[in-house]
């Protein structure tokens, strides 16, 4: 990114880039650019599992509300990019598990994180993730994540932790490795 990224708004960007995480359940995440906190990432996961978009819920779980969430919250203290709020919305997760359980070859097992009907809510808090798709290959659950933007230096560490837990949750619920 530093060498090949183009100046785009207030950052550097690369477009149409993909990568594979070979062992997503290994949550020993390191980042030389910042200190990563597994304790905080776990609290964020518990917040997502609560299905509650309120930053106050995160504060209850973690003991404080990180400044980034205060900045992103709407006037009611809700965060629209809370993955738990999004994946459980409209029974999406149940639908995905049902599709995978009934047909391991399904191409319908997808979660929508970004909801176009919520564009007005996204003024200060637009989800970076658009969608998550699940496929089964050799009885193993694979997951593909599609992002509109990826804060590789700061956000990705926590996102990877959350994504691995989403994959683990869906695998357990649908009976795949």
Where are these regions (language model features)?
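Terminal, non-catalytic protein-protein interaction segments that mediate quaternary/complex assembly
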Residues: 1-177
């Amino acid at each position: 990114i530093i060498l090949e990224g183009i100046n785009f708004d207030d950052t550097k960007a690369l477009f149409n880039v993909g990568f594979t995480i070979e062992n997503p359940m290994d949550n020993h995440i390191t980042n030389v650019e910042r200190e990563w906190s597994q304790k905080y990432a776990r609290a964020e996961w518990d917040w997502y599992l609560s299905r509650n978009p309120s930053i106050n819920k995160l504060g209850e779980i973690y003991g404080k509300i990180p400044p980034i969430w205060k900045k992103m919250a709407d006037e009611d203290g809700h965060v629209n990019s809370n993955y738990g709020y999004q994946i459980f919305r409209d029974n999406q997760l149940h639908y995905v598990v049902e599709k995978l359980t009934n047909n391991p070859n399904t191409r319908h097992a997808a979660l929508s994180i970004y909801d176009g009907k919520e564009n007005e809510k996204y003024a200060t808090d637009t989800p970076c993730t658009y969608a998550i798709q699940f496929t089964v290959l050799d009885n193993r659950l694979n997951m593909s994540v599609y992002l509109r933007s990826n804060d590789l230096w700061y956000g990705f560490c926590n996102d990877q932790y959350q994504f691995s837990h989403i994959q683990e949750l869906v695998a357990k619920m649908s009976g795949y490795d």
